[in-house]
Amino acid sequence: MGGSREFRAEEHSNQFHSIIAMAIWLGAIHFNVALVLCSLIFLPPSLSLMVLGLLSLFIFIPIDHRSKYGRKLARYICKHACNYFPVSLYVEDYEAFQPNRAYVFGYEPHSVLPIGVVALCDLTGFMPIPNIKVLASSAIFYTPFLRHIWTWLGLTAASRKNFTSLLDSGYSCVLVPGGVQETFHMQHDAENVFLSRRRGFVRIAMEQGSPLVPVFCFGQARVYKWWKPDCDLYLKLSRAIRFTPICFWGVFGSPLPCRQPMHVVVGKPIEVTKTLKPTDEEIAKFHGQYVEALRDLFERHKSRVGYDLELKIL
């Protein structure tokens, strides 16, 4: 791997700033839940309704994507969050990436939250690609406060329209192909990635002529403890709301994740044949190449990073 390169974040921050950055980045979900519960329990009905009304207002307030203060906050998070775990990024063939091309990064696994993607954000500055967007569940963008912070970090709703438009505009896109259903299939003793029937991202990559890039994050499954129901109704609900309700917690039951090292590994780009209307056979061919490349990536690096979980491709 002569063109490989590794980036580490241990010297980018001190512990105080890394904790503050993590709290701002990931604390909004728990903050919203705590605010609603406290208002319902401790406030009179009129004030509780006012709190709920204000939260609803934050769902619909337009977001300035280029906000000076928003982007400054996002830079702060990207600079210091990688140090918290810490997160490292290993690129197998750094020189294979061209700054003027748009790539489709298939990031796995989803875990509770795919927070290792911070290593791929353009504001982190590890990858030699100037324009990167992360596609995320649309439910995030209906969550007060979280939608603002994550938009400034470079996340956008995962839709075919957004995906195609971004690639067409020269943006590389990071997505988790397994999505909501992968979260439903999580196990504590294995890495389950839901890929066998996930081919839409390959179709769009072929339509745009964008190379597929396998990415795996080792250690992400261990940064949160979690519990979820095990029933068909739960799966149907998750699909309906395009989000997986799950009980998760970190340090002392807080939203701060446990400090476990994460190793994000980026494989070599897989060139695809550009075609406006790819056939099912053509899609299956490149989908198979991506799945095999992801499996090989996992096997090549699991011993290097000391990972003992088994990879299961569902």
From Swiss-Prot:
Reaction(s) catalysed by this chain's protein: an acyl-CoA + a 1,2-diacyl-sn-glycerol = a triacyl-sn-glycerol + CoA; 1,2-dihexanoyl-sn-glycerol + (9Z)-octadecenoyl-CoA = 1,2-dihexanoyl-3-(9Z-octadecenoyl)-sn-glycerol + CoA
One of the record's GO molecular function terms: diacylglycerol O-acyltransferase activity
Keyword Lipid biosynthesis set for record: yes
Keyword terms of this UniProt record: Acyltransferase, Endoplasmic reticulum, Glycerol metabolism, Lipid biosynthesis, Lipid droplet, Lipid metabolism, Membrane, Transferase, Transmembrane, Transmembrane helix
Subcellular location: Endoplasmic reticulum membrane; Lipid droplet
Cellular-component GO terms for this entry: endoplasmic reticulum membrane; lipid droplet
Annotated family: Belongs to the diacylglycerol acyltransferase family.
Name by which UniProt lists this protein: Diacylglycerol O-acyltransferase 2
